[in-house]
Design a protein with these regions (language model features):
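Acidic, Ser/Thr/Gly/Pro-rich intrinsically disordered interaction regions
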Residues: 1-96, 104-238
Length: 238
C-alpha cells in the first residue's frame, strides 16, 4: 500500500473503529525503529566512555567509581544513570512494542473479518488464534497461522511474559579492551508452557532486534496487502 490509511475512508467502510489500532500499530513499528537507534547510540557512548577512561589519569578514572561502575555512568537531567540499565530497559521496551503490535493487529483483524461472526471481549492475538477458524478469508487465516508458528513470535511472547511477570533477563555488554569494540548480548532464557519448556539461546542483541523488527514489518505488509482489497474497492462498504 503506497498511501496513507485515512479515517474518512475507514468511516465510509464502516471501519472507523480500526483507525485507533492502525495508528497504534504504526507507532509500535516506529518505536521499534527508535529502540534500534538507541541501542546503537548507547553502545557508542559506552565505548567512548571506555576510551576516555583508558586515556585518562588514574585519578580521573577513580573519580568515576561510585554507586555505578566506572565507564557505565551517564548523566540525564543531572541524574547519574547506568548505561547498562538503560540498555536493558531499551530492549525490554523494544520487545514490548513488538508484542503490542500483534495485539493491535488482532484488534484490526477482529473488527474487519470476525466481528460479524462472534463477539469477543478484550481481544488480543491469543484470542484471535483460538478463533481463526471463524475467519472466511484464507489469506488472513494463513497469516495468523504463519505468525503463531514463527519462532520469533514465540521469542517475543516468552521474553515479554517473563520480564513482566517473573524477572529481568540479563543483557550484558561484552568489551574488547584492546579495540574497545562492544557487543550487546541477550542471555538465554526458558519459559514453561503446559509442561513443555521452551528455551531461547544466547543472542547478539543488535542482530535479534533487526530480525524481530523485520518480522513485524513483514507481517504488517502481508496484512496490508490483503486489507488493500477492501480499502480500495469502489463501493465496498461493510
Amino acid at each position: 500500500m503506497g498511501y496513507e490509511i485515512k479515517l474518512s475512508r475507514l468511516t465510509e467502510l464502516g471501519l472507523f473503529e480500526t483507525d485507533l489500532y492502525f495508528t497504534a500499530a504504526f507507532n509500535a513499528t516506529e518505536a521499534m525503529r527508535v529502540n534500534r537507534a538507541v541501542e546503537v547510540e548507547l553502545i557508542n557512548k559506552r565505548a567512548e566512555k571506555a576510551r576516555d577512561i583508558a586515556a585518562a589519569s588514574s585519578n580521573f578514572a577513580d573519580s568515576l567509581f561510585g554507586t555505578i561502575r566506572g565507564g557505565d555512568c551517564c548523566v540525564i537531567n543531572g541524574i547519574n544513570v547506568s548505561m547498562s540499565f538503560l540498555y536493558n530497559l531499551n530492549y525490554e521496551d523494544f520487545i514490548n512494542h513488538a508484542r503490542n503490535y500483534f495485539d493491535y493487529l488482532a484488534h484490526i483483524i477482529y473488527l474487519v473479518y470476525l466481528r460479524d461472526k462472534k463477539k469477543i471481549d478484550e481481544i488480543d492475538f491469543g484470542k484471535l488464534i483460538k478463533n481463526r477458524s471463524l475467519i472466511d478469508n484464507a489469506e488472513i487465516s494463513d497469516l495468523i497461522s504463519t505468525i503463531e508458528t514463527n519462532d520469533l513470535f514465540t521469542y517475543i511472547s516468552d521474553y515479554n511474559n517473563i520480564t513482566k511477570h517473573n524477572h529481568g533477563i540479563n543483557t550484558p555488554i561484552n568489551t574488547n579492551f584492546r579495540t574497545f569494540e562492544m557487543v550487546g548480548m541477550v542471555f538465554p532464557f526458558s519459559k514453561e508452557i503446559k509442561g513443555v519448556e521452551r528455551t531461547h539461546d544466547l543472542a547478539l542483541m543488535r542482530d535479534k532486534m533487526k530480525e524481530i523488527h523485520q518480522f513485524v514489518l513483514d507481517s504488517q505488509q502481508a496484512f496490508l496487502k490483503e486489507f488493500d482489497k477492501i480499502y480500495t474497492q469502489e463501493g465496498n462498504e461493510k
